[in-house]
Amino acid sequence: MNAEISERQKEIITVSLELIAKKGIQGLTIKNLAKKIGFTEAAVYRHYENKIQILIAILDYFREDTNRFFVNEMKSEENATQKIEHLFLNHFKTFSETPSLVSVVFAEEIFRNEAVLIEKVAEIMKKNTQILLSIIESGQKKSEIRSDINSHNLAIIIMGSLRMFVKQWQMSDYSFSLTERGTEYIKSVIKLIKN
């Protein structure tokens, strides 16, 4: 998590994710949060102004985490398809460890009335897509990834399929191993894009 946040803020984020996992985003209230942590609502307000600020902190946590994955893969000497495979597997690992992140990261419909949250999700998507696009374009130049499909379209296909796969896992009430089935799934995606 961000080095600038306090241990108490980390605890609030962690417990917020637990509440979201059990009750959905609607169940994340300052009252429920204070009760679960075991202190007053006023104590929560000392760290975060409101529920929106907590959700922003969760999205920032995810952004930092995924940004690290994407930047590390950009620096990697592996080929483009291996980089894409690692990106998928890192996302599967992150979501498996914290399933409630899916409810926040893929919740733009719920956030539609909160511009700051929509902007935060859009920022994450844009940054991740830009880095993925760089990996794809590099792979196309090296003939590792098919070049008969526009790189922007491939990025949308890859990101969209990742999202759909993770949402299916969530909608099945996490009934299968995301990392195990995800490993098989990413191999199929790689077959589709490989040159």
Task: Give the predicted meaning of each segment.
Residues 1-7:
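N-terminal intrinsically disordered/low-complexity leader segments
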